[in-house]
Amino acid sequence: MWFQLKIEHCPNDKIEEITEELEECGALSITLTDKNDNPVLEPEPGTTPLWPEVIIHALFAQAEEAQYAREQLVAKRPSLHCSLELLADKNWERAWMDDFRPQRFGNRLWVCPTWLPPPEPDAVNLILDPGLAFGTGTHATTSLCLTWLEQADLKNKSIIDYGCGSGILSLAAIKLGAKHVYAVDIDNQALQATQSNAHANHITESQLSISFPEALQNPVHLVIANILLAPLISLKERFHQLLPSGAHLVTSGILEEQAPLLIDAYDSAFTHIATEYCEGWSLLVFTSK
């Protein structure tokens, strides 16, 4: 059993403070969601992305911890609305599994959960068990990246997947012919998820290196980065160091209206050659100057 504390009417300038207090009370995980299902916006580099009204969900293993956290928060901030819900392990897992079905990207790539057989056994099948924290291909930016990889010539290419999450892009690239992929992320849980998914797909160390970004040294043929605008801009010089002239950089994770900002920011180091859009999100392709 798990105990979920739902916190509403949170002032945006108090969210960080509230999440720190929840961690001190023993929260195992904390999730921020938008009450009105608006996209997270980052209009200027370096700004903090926040929705107009945020809901905080905190997961606890013990009812006493969750109740204590609620009492502490309400005592300090009477305007907060806190509700406690009991979550059954089986129901939580079942709901997640029901939402994840096999998906096709392009003509030949399928992403399939571990608990279902691939619809086309002879296609390029990526078996994925992402857990609750990382991507499964359902988000538009991941879909854009997978579709681009599916149509690209990756044979014998070395690739960096910057911000690998579940490893979905890394593993897809290898399945599609890449010689070696460097999967990097600043989150250790992402690296563990990537390692687990690599094992499920029989990917070897000769094909995939998993590490923090600081370990990157060798130039590659392609960098793909599905992350937010601010880190994309801040990583411009780093990407340029890793890509020889003419090599490709593929970026996603940004809204359509943010695309011109990234193109302008990269102009001194990269040439913009293509753009794809999906559900209000964009994928940009550059070559290194």
UniProtKB/Swiss-Prot annotation:
Please state where this protein is localized: Cytoplasm
* Keywords of the record: Cytoplasm, Methyltransferase, S-adenosyl-L-methionine, Transferase
Q: Which InterPro entries does UniProt cross-reference here?
A: Ribosomal_L11_MeTrfase_PrmA (IPR050078), Ribosomal_PrmA_MeTrfase (IPR004498), SAM-dependent_MTases_sf (IPR029063)
**Catalytic activity entry:** L-lysyl-[protein] + 3 S-adenosyl-L-methionine = N(6),N(6),N(6)-trimethyl-L-lysyl-[protein] + 3 S-adenosyl-L-homocysteine + 3 H(+)
Mind listing the GO molecular function terms for this protein?
A: protein-lysine N-methyltransferase activity
Which positions bind S-adenosyl-L-methionine? T142, G163, D185, N226
GO terms classed as biological process: methylation
One cellular component term (GO) for this entry is: cytosol
Q: Enzyme class, one word?
A: transferase
Q: Which CDD domains match?
A: AdoMet_MTases (cd02440)
Which Pfam family, any one, appears in the UniProt record? PrmA
Q: What is its EC number?
A: 2.1.1.-
Entry's family note: Belongs to the methyltransferase superfamily. PrmA family.
Q: What's this protein's function? A: Methylates ribosomal protein L11.
Protein's name in the database: Ribosomal protein L11 methyltransferase
